[in-house]
């Protein structure tokens, strides 16, 4: 009873936390309110403005926002009260227990065991449209291009060569499937093993291992043969490395081993997806800024040289090799807003209307414009590709002019263009997973999936393991925001750096996505879920010495973390 009274009297004194708690709760409530205004009458990504549009604000919409605010604020408050009592659950009492390498293999085997029904049903995995393009490049039916990262294409080529040696492309793709499954299981196992070495309790390790094994988005992404799985895995390793830096308070940043690991991970993240370069630049800058007082000149110089080398290879060298073939580019979000204004007959001058008409016939725009998918416009003959890529400056000026005249239309267009990345209530099947073969794959390469369970037993379990409920990408970004909030509550401010690569990934997608729903773009947010529950409790190495004392003492003893 006395404990219950203490809980009721609890009052947080962290003003920054309280302020951000109100801000994040309000952001969530606003997304719920804005979602309630969207009338969506189609489950297809090609939905037109007849199928998806904004309605007028009603009392019901306002109440949805208010109720959402109250519910989220209440939940956060309950967690806020309970979270201070959870250190005993998160950490082992015996921190001097010797660390055994066989724990890694136990975790690895457990994850693979849970994945086995998926592996035996969908082996070797599903080839996506982008991967199909990479295969076409590998067999010389398309020219090599870094639009789909060339490193990923060359990785596929290595395995196709293995298939050539055996006179069977099926063997090559099977080998690639096994490789990706093994690497993904190993990376996830390494994360749990890393927590084990940080003295997290066996209970926490078991929960995370079970999550990796049971949650469908892990085995299905291990079986999704597209660039996003390896990219997110190397990005996840990069994040674990950032966490290692944080737990050592940046004292390892000048170590030769750390410099090599950090540089290699920067290179891998940059080359496995094109937005990775911006992610590592932003993250590295902040890491350097936070730990600059540690005299990390070696780290700064090494990171700078690595960034310059990456730029030199991806820029001038790739251009010389003919891998950067596009003579120009456009921002899908920007063009989508301009076309939305045109398709909805927004406010514009006759001159602006003519300019848009040159970009793409306005009458045709009204027929083919889809606010959720920009790529439905680009194939039509009326889309003037040459004009758009050579008139970037003029288009940007037009974008600003129309923004001033049509702010509401711009907000609506942007909201629909990025719908799946901010709206927790919306999820489509498009680019959610790729465990099935893309249509036409067998026309270019003789490979197929084998359902071994059906082959051996005469019955398939596809209906049992197929995705039945899809989760919005926005759920996972809000999990990160909530986790950051509790990290701030516990005053572990440097731990916030660990979230940055995932947030920057989401941010780059929000700036330039051509499609409103694509879990693969931000799959790193899913990989981050166990981290979200760990980071608020992650301590610096020097604090480990105090854990045993803290956990061993009575409840009335308090330990200062910072």
Task: Annotate the PLM regions.
Residues 74, 178-199, 237:
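Transmembrane-helix motifs of polytopic, lipid-linked glycan transferases
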Residues 101-106, 191-214, 232-233:
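Transmembrane-helix signature of polytopic, membrane-embedded enzymes
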Residues 122-134, 143-159, 163-171, 524:
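Extracytoplasmic catalytic/substrate-binding loops of multi-pass membrane glycan-assembly enzymes
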């Amino acid at each position: 009873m006395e404990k219950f009274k203490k809980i009721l009297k609890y009052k947080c004194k962290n003003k920054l936390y309280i302020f951000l708690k109100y801000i994040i709760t309000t952001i969530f409530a606003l997304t719920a309110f804005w979602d309630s205004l969207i009338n969506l009458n189609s489950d297809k990504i090609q939905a037109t403005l007849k199928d998806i549009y904004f309605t007028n604000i009603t009392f019901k919409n306002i109440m949805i926002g208010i109720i959402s605010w109250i519910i989220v604020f209440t939940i956060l408050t309950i967690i806020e009260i309970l979270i201070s009592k959870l250190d005993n659950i998160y950490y082992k009492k015996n921190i001097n227990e010797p660390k055994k390498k066989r724990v890694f293999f136990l975790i690895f085997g457990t994850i693979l065991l849970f994945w086995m029904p998926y592996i035996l049903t969908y082996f070797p995995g599903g080839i996506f449209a982008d991967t199909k393009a990479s295969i076409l490049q590998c067999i010389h039916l398309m020219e090599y291009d870094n639009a789909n990262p060339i490193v990923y294409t060359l990785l596929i080529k290595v395995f196709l060569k293995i298939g050539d040696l055996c006179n069977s492309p099926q063997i090559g793709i099977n080998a690639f499937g096994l490789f990706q499954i093994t690497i993904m299981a190993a990376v996830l196992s390494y994360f749990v093993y890393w927590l084990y070495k940080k003295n997290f309790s066996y209970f926490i390790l078991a929960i995370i291992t079970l999550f990796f094994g049971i949650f469908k988005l892990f085995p299905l992404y291990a079986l999704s043969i597209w660039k996003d799985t390896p990219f997110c895995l190397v990005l996840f390793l990069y994040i674990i490395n950032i966490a290692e830096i944080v737990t050592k308070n940046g004292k390892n940043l000048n170590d030769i081993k750390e410099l090599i690991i950090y540089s290699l991970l920067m290179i891998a993240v940059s080359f496995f997806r094109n937005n990775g370069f911006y992610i590592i630049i932003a993250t590295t800058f902040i890491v350097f800024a936070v730990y600059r007082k540690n005299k990390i000149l070696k780290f700064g110089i090494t990171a700078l040289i690595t960034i310059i080398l990456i730029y030199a290879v991806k820029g001038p060298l790739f251009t010389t090799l003919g891998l950067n073939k596009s003579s120009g580019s456009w921002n899908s979000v920007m063009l989508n807003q301009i076309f939305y204004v045109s398709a909805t007959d927004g406010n514009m001058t006759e001159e602006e209307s003519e300019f848009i008409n040159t970009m793409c016939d306005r009458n045709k725009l009204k027929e083919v414009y889809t606010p959720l998918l920009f790529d439905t416009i680009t194939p039509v003959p009326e889309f003037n590709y040459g004009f758009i890529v050579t008139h970037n400056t003029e288009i940007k000026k037009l974008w600003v002019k129309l923004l001033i005249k049509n702010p509401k239309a711009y907000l609506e267009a942007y909201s629909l263009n990025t719908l799946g990345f901010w709206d927790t209530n919306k999820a489509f099947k498009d680019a959610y997973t790729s465990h099935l073969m893309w249509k036409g794959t067998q026309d270019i390469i003789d490979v197929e999936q084998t359902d071994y369970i059906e082959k051996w037993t005469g019955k398939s379990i596809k209906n049992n393991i197929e995705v039945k409920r899809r989760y919005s990408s926005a759920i996972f970004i809000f999990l990160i925001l909530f986790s950051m909030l509790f990290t701030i509550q516990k005053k572990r401010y440097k731990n916030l750096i660990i979230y940055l690569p995932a947030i920057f990934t989401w941010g780059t997608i929000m700036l330039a996505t051509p499609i409103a729903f694509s879990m693969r773009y931000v799959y790193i947010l899913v990989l981050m879920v166990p981290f979200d529950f760990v980071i608020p409790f992650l301590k610096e190495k020097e604090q480990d010495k105090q854990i045993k004392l803290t956990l061993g003492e009575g409840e009335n003893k308090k330990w200062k973390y910072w």
